[in-house]
Amino acid sequence: MTVLTPRERDVLKLVAQGQSNKDIAQRLVLSEHTVHRHLANILRKLDLSSRAAAAAWGVRAGLV
């Protein structure tokens, strides 16, 4: 999982917990746009096509 930055891992953990971008932004004190960009980078780096796939990946990786 070293391919993801620490902040991307934080975002992925919250995505896997079912949090919305707005909720993640508030929790991590980021803009919604920044959360959106982190999620886009996560999808690209992990070669995934959806938020649901990212959430499943996070669960399998033990983030939740």
Regions found by a protein language model. Give the residues of each.
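Helix-turn-helix DNA-binding segment
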Residues: 1-40, 45, 53, 60-61
